[in-house]
């Protein structure tokens, strides 16, 4: 009677094969579990073929393990012949289902069915294989047994045809997978590469050992190896089916080489000690050897992996290690670290961006927080292609990423698992996919530097606050200074009380504009959430009228260039204070270009819809380049405008979200810019007429400034020098012109660099006072052009810039610098330095007169 004990299977080869069976079974259970999680259909798809293939692999490995145990000699030749035929059929069906699996994949890719001729090959070879293996003497005639792992199988006359069938399946499977690569996406190529790699390892080892060594050479000592290596196909193919994110070939080669080097270090010396020992003593020494390997593995792996990295990448640090080493770089400079990260990821120059959670594409956050940790464009493409149910929910996201050339969106999570920043990357310059190791490394890096990034954001916020207030307050302060100078003149000339009162009122209005600017800037940089502010139903016409009427315009010329909505009113839920600041911000951005674009206007209109209503804020100024229009809602992003915080439009987006809506930008460079403010339709809302006051038809009259024209046209005195004043702000030009009038110097004006070059060409100019930051053409470019025309003409910067780069450019391209707003004494000093003595003396005489 047969007596089974565990000692019968305690052989290294048998244990290896049974361990492989355990791994394959666990993988198969995990695979089925993942399919259930994803609600995948199994029957009629490639999943059914893969599961059948996996079951056959388990049967094949188990049957091979039998030949390396004590069961082989104990049960005898008849049982050995049965297990040999069983192993034949198990291996055949593994190859057959692998082939059918590839047919099913190819059919799904072309959105069709498996070809009839492919089904015919599968059925015919299966029937033939069953026939020759079930009928005695056709494939296995006898098994000569010496002991475990020591046996010889005598093959039958049909064995060669049986192996030809197996080889045919191998070839046809590879043909199917290679054919799938034609006109495939990058993701499909990666999947097929993994499958081909797994199939090649398994099938080639099977072909070489089973065909070469057993059939032709009669050596059965290595028959355990192909079943053990079958795990490679299981894992490679299964991994490719379950995931859409893959490790690069180089990284896999690096890991494999590192492990092989460590194994070589252990095998060579320990093998010399272990092999000469008797079998009983081998088990005694095995325990301390295993302990030694466990203790020293990590240390040796760390040392040898450097050499593996050098052989694979040409550097002792892998790209993953180089990415993780950027942690210290982020602490020194986030911008520099981002540039280095982009270079490591092979992203085009400065295209890798780290934006705050106020980014325009809010649905990025919705997807990231709900069902995935990273958005990868190629993965979305595959989901849309193969999953009909996913098309509705992801088509808009796919289209947005496609239009913005976005390949990767990765979140940074703050407290409460809320998204604080987004890492947004375009496609790689080499058009390759992001590998799994790159994505994992970047995620780890961003997690480590999260606190650094948040601290940097707060520092930038503080700098933006200081810079913006300093820059924006120059114009109101210049206006106050201008009114004081006018007031001084009027007092000296004994002007009537009404005129003096008017000067004081104009000065007070300038101070009020300054206060309003400070309020706007403080709102922009505030961390307070707009969601906490109360909202109420109101007429959108009323809200716009009130916002515009409360804005502090510099003069009535600006007011005359604004058109308010007169038709299609609607009800919106909003907070009037917050809405006012949104309109203030849009007006401020638009009128910044009014001097340089004298024909530009602001037109505010409305449009209603079934689900949302729209307020359209349109200005016909310079427009915005389409390539950067999606960036304008990023924090700290500023376009052709100096001194701003870069936070205004991000603040507008936050406010609109708090109203349940959003703001989007549509622009055409050189033609117009439109901001569309979307408000959700208010259900059961009263008529808009009942929520509004009568139209502010007289708002322009209420806002008209009685501003004194302190800078009238001046008659040119040919005996006096001429100074060209270049500044995009009228109040700054008016102040300088007033001082020049007092000094008896002629003046010409230009509102941007391009205009300055034209005025210089048409007039004789002795000195130029040049602002630095202006639309159309900045002061640096204008100075360079003027110096090419007349190198001797002095150019003095009229600027409040204090940045190191700007000061270096001023020293390089200009002849001096004058603070803005300037003073009479400072201007007199500049005239004395740069105009000839006769000109300076005549100016002084004119002043004394």
From Swiss-Prot:
Mutagenesis / variant outcome for changing residue 475 to R: Constitutive luminescence
Catalytic activity reported: ATP + protein L-histidine = ADP + protein N-phospho-L-histidine
Annotated EC: 2.7.13.3, 3.1.3.-
Cellular compartment(s): Cell inner membrane
CDD domains: HATPase, HisKA, REC_hyHK_CKI1_RcsC-like
Membrane topology field: Multi-pass membrane protein
PROSITE patterns documented for this protein: HIS_KIN (PS50109), RESPONSE_REGULATORY (PS50110)
GO molecular function, one term: phosphorelay sensor kinase activity
Modified residues (4-aspartylphosphate): 771
Outcome, altering residue 771 to A: LuxN null phenotype. Wild-type level of light
Record keyword NADP present: no
Regulation of its activity: The phosphatase activity is constitutive and the kinase activity is regulated by the presence or absence of AI-1. At low cell density the kinase activity overrides the phosphatase activity.
Domain of life where this protein originates: Bacteria
Annotated ranges, domain Response regulatory: 722-835
NCBIfam families listed in its UniProt record: LuxN_Vibrio
Job description of the protein: At low cell density, in the absence of AI-1 (autoinducer 1), LuxN has a kinase activity and autophosphorylates on His-471. The phosphoryl group is then transferred on Asp-771 of the response regulator domain. The phosphoryl group is transferred to LuxU, and ultimately to LuxO. At high cell density, in the presence of AI-1, the kinase activity is inactivated, and the response regulator domain has a phosphatase activity. LuxN phosphatase acts on itself.
UniProt name for this protein: Autoinducer 1 sensor kinase/phosphatase LuxN
Organism: Vibrio campbellii (strain ATCC BAA-1116)
């Amino acid at each position: 009677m047969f007596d089974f004990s565990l000692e019968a299977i305690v052989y290294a080869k048998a244990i290896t094969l049974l361990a492989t069976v355990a791994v394959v079974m666990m993988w198969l259970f995990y695979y089925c579990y993942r399919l259930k999680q994803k609600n995948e259909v199994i029957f009629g798809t490639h999943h059914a073929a893969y599961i059948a293939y996996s079951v056959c692999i388990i049967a094949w490995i188990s049957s091979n393990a039998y030949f390396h145990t004590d069961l082989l000699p104990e049960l005898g030749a008849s049982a050995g012949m049965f297990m040999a035929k069983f192993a034949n059929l198990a291996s055949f069906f593994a190859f057959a289902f692998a082939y059918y699996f590839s047919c099913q994949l190819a059919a799904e890719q072309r959105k069709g069915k498996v070809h009839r001729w492919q089904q015919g090959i599968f059925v015919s070879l299966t029937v033939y294989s069953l026939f020759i293996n079930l009928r005695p003497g056709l494939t296995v005639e006898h098994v000569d047994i010496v002991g475990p792992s020591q046996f010889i199988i005598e093959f039958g006359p049909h064995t060669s045809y049986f192996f030809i069938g197996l080889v045919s399946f191998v070839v046809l499977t590879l043909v199917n997978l290679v054919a799938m690569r034609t006109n495939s996406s990058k993701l499909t190529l990666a999947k097929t590469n993994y499958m081909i790699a797994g199939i090649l390892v398994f099938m080639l080892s099977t072909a070489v050992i089973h065909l070469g060594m057993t059939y032709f050479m009669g050596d059965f000592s290595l028959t355990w190896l192909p079943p053990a290596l079958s795990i490679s196909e299981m894992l490679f193919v299964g991994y490719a089916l379950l995931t859409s994110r893959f490790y690069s070939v180089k990284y896999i080669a690096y890991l494999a080489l590192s492990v092989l080097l460590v194994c070589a270090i252990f095998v060579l010396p320990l093998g010399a000690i272990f092999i000469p020992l008797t079998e009983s003593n081998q088990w005694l020494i095995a325990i301390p050897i295993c302990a030694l390997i466990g203790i020293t593995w990590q240390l040796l792996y760390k040392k040898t992996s450097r050499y593996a990295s050098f052989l694979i990448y040409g550097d002792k640090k892998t790209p993953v290690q180089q990415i993780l080493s950027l942690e210290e770089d982020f602490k020194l400079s986030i911008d520099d670290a981002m540039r280095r990260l982009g270079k490591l990821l092979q992203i085009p120059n400065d295209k890798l961006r780290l934006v705050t959670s106020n980014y325009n594409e809010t649905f990025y956050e919705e997807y990231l927080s709900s069902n995935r940790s990273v958005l990868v464009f190629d993965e979305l493409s595959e989901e849309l292609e193969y999953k009909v149910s996913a098309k509705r929910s992801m088509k808009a996201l796919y289209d947005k990423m496609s239009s913005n050339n976005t390949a990767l969106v990765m979140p940074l999570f703050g407290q409460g698992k809320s998204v604080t920043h987004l890492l947004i990357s375009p496609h790689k310059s080499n058009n390759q996919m992001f590998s799994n190791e790159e994505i994992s490394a970047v995620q780890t890096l961003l997690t480590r530097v999260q606190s650094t990034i948040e601290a940097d954001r707060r520092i930038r916020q503080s700098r933006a606050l200081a810079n913006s207030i300093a820059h924006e307050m120059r114009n109101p302060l210049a206006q106050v200074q201008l009114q004081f100078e006018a007031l001084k003149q009027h007092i000296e000339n004994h002007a009537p009380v009404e005129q003096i009162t008017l000067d004081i009122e104009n000065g007070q209005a300038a101070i009020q504009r300054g206060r309003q600017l400070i309020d706007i800037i403080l709102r922009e940089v505030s961390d307070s959430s707009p969601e906490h502010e109360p909202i109420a139903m109101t007429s959108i016409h009323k809200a716009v009228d009130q916002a515009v009427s409360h804005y502090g315009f510099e003069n009535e010329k600006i007011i005359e260039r604004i058109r308010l909505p007169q038709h299609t009113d609607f009800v919106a839920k909003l907070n009037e204070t917050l809405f006012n600041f949104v309109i203030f911000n849009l007006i401020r951005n638009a009128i910044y270009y009014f001097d340089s674009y004298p024909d530009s206007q602001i037109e505010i209109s409305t449009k209603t819809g079934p689900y949302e209503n729209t307020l359209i804020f349109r200005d016909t100024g310079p427009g915005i380049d389409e390539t950067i229009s999606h960036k304008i809602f990023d924090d700290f992003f500023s376009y052709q405008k100096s001194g701003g915080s870069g936070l205004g439009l991000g603040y507008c987006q936050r406010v609109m979200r708090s109203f349940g809506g959003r703001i989007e930008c549509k622009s055409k460079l050189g033609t117009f810019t439109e901001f569309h403010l979307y408000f959700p339709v208010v259900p059961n809302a009263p008529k808009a007429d009942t929520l509004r006051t009568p139209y502010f038809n007289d708002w322009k009259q209420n806002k008209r400034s009685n501003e004194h024209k302190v800078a009238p046209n001046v008659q040119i005195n040919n005996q006096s020098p001429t100074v060209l004043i270049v500044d995009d702000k009228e109040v700054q030009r008016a102040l300088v012109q007033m001082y020049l009038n007092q000094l008896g110097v002629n003046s010409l004006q230009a509102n941007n660099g391009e205009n300055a070059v034209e005025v210089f060409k048409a007039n004789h100019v002795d000195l130029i006072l040049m602002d630095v930051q202006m639309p159309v053409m900045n002061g640096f470019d204008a100075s360079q052009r003027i110096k090419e025309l007349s190198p001797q003409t002095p150019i003095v910067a009229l600027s409040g810039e204090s940045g190191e780069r700007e000061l270096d450019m001023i020293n390089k391209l200009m002849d001096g610098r004058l603070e803005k707003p300037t003073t009479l004494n400072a201007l007199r000093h500049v005239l004395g330095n740069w105009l000839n003595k006769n000109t300076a003396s005549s100016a002084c005489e004119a002043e004394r007169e």
